[in-house]
């Protein structure tokens, strides 16, 4: 699996933007990705040093379309803490 296949997209929320000052960044990742794969992918894509990776599985919400009830897909969130002094340039200015 390539690094760009593991990291699906960055998560930009009010809470994640507040955590960026602490060097913590949030990403949506593949459900089957483990912490080691996530760490290697972030280091390869952004050229930074990862200190810690926390992951959580997020259950999909129930959604209704008229009389039909469906469910969004489950997904995985990764909170990545970088070495002090490192930052990801894409997120700066948020």
From Swiss-Prot:
Gene source species: Symbiobacterium thermophilum (strain DSM 24528 / JCM 14929 / IAM 14863 / T)
HAMAP family from the UniProt entry: Ribosomal_uL23_B
Any coiled-coil regions, as ranges: none
Domain of life (superkingdom): Bacteria
One Gene Ontology cellular component annotation held by this UniProt entry: ribosome
GO molecular function terms listed in the Swiss-Prot or TrEMBL record: rRNA binding; structural constituent of ribosome
Record's keyword terms, sorted: Ribonucleoprotein, Ribosomal protein, RNA-binding, rRNA-binding
Subunit structure: Part of the 50S ribosomal subunit. Contacts protein L29, and trigger factor when it is bound to the ribosome.
GO biological process terms, semicolon-separated: translation
Summary of the function given for this chain in its UniProt record: One of the early assembly proteins it binds 23S rRNA. One of the proteins that surrounds the polypeptide exit tunnel on the outside of the ribosome. Forms the main docking site for trigger factor binding to the ribosome.
Pfam families, sorted: Ribosomal_L23 (PF00276)
Protein's UniProt name: Large ribosomal subunit protein uL23
């Amino acid at each position: 699996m390539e690094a760009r296949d593991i990291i699906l997209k960055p998560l930009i929320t009010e809470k994640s933007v507040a955590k960026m000052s602490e060097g913590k960044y949030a990403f949506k990742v593949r459900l089957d990705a483990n912490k080691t794969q996530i760490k290697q992918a972030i280091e390869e894509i952004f050229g930074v040093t990862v200190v810690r990776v926390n992951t959580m599985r997020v259950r999909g919400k129930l959604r209704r379309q008229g009389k039909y009830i469906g469910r969004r897909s489950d997904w995985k969130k990764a909170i990545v803490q970088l070495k002090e002094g490192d930052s990801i340039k894409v997120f700066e200015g948020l």
